Amino acid sequence: MISAQAYGENGKMKEYHYTGPVEHKFSPYAFNGGTVLAVAGEDFAIVASDTRLSEGYSIHSRDSPKCYKLTDTTVLGCSGFHGDCLTLTKIIEARLKMYKHSNNKSMTSGAIAAMLSTILYGRRFFPYYVYNIIGGLDEEGRGAVYSFDPVGSYQRDTYKAGGSASAMLQPLLDNQIGFKNMENVEHVPLTQEKAVQLVKDVFISAAERDVYTGDALKVCIVSKEGIKEEIVPLRKD
């Protein structure tokens, strides 16, 4: 029931007076969830992501992987604001085509990482809301992982997780691959089969606890034979 105090003597609704100026806020960003992960081995690299695209408590798509093939030896994983992910990958793909036409060869993983750093830094005052991880092979055929922050700072890692479930995945990777703070443990070289199984296991665990991660897992395995893809189902609730 509407109170009679809201109306004046002429029957029209009174104007409300605010104590200060009214601000019209607009946020150009949205967080669309999702998790990406990359692991580098002796002669291979793995980049994996889930396929859920969500915002708040709404799921926009169950088939939106966040792994993008850039060259035959490089895969980009990015999560954050999906619009910025699409824009950024289109810019990178255009730069790669220009480089190939000019030099008659594909850009290496390290060169792509350096290029991506300059692209992100160029937008530092209005940054892309994207967390990027590059996985691939370096010039010597060894696995390489490069992780970035939104404004272009990057470093080479052996393994890295990013996105909504990164706080859950990174400690598991530290334990199983990095052997952090572990004594009397034999550091066995990571095989491709073990790495793939580990990636599947940690994503299955993350999907149990993170509402923004789920539906399916896309795994891209980069080796000298090329890029092999696998799809693993995750929980869909």
UniProtKB/Swiss-Prot annotation:
Consequence of gene loss (knockout): Morphant larvae have a strikingly smaller head compared with controls, a mild degree of edema surrounding the eyes, and a significant decrease in head/body length ratio. The eye size is significantly decreased in the morphants compared with controls.
Cell compartment(s), UniProt: Cytoplasm; Nucleus
Keywords noted in UniProt: Cytoplasm, Nucleus, Proteasome
SUPFAM superfamilies tied to this protein: N-terminal nucleophile aminohydrolases (Ntn hydrolases) (SSF56235)
Signal sequence extent: none
GO terms, biological process: brain development; proteolysis involved in protein catabolic process
Pfam families assigned to the protein according to its UniProt record, in alphabetical order: Proteasome
Keyword Nucleus in annotation: yes
GO cellular component: cytoplasm; nucleus; proteasome core complex
PANTHER family: METALLOPROTEASE TLDD, PROTEASOME SUBUNIT BETA TYPE-1
Family the entry assigns: Belongs to the peptidase T1B family.
Role noted for this protein: Non-catalytic component of the 20S core proteasome complex involved in the proteolytic degradation of most intracellular proteins. This complex plays numerous essential roles within the cell by associating with different regulatory particles. Associated with two 19S regulatory particles, forms the 26S proteasome and thus participates in the ATP-dependent degradation of ubiquitinated proteins.
Oligomer status and interactors: The 26S proteasome consists of a 20S proteasome core and two 19S regulatory subunits. The 20S proteasome core is a barrel-shaped complex made of 28 subunits that are arranged in four stacked rings. The two outer rings are each formed by seven alpha subunits, and the two inner rings are formed by seven beta subunits. The proteolytic activity is exerted by three beta-subunits psmb5, psmb6 and psmb7.
Protein known as: Proteasome subunit beta type-1
Organism expressing this protein natively: Danio rerio
Source lineage: Eukaryota, Metazoa, Chordata, Craniata, Vertebrata
Gene (name only): psmb1
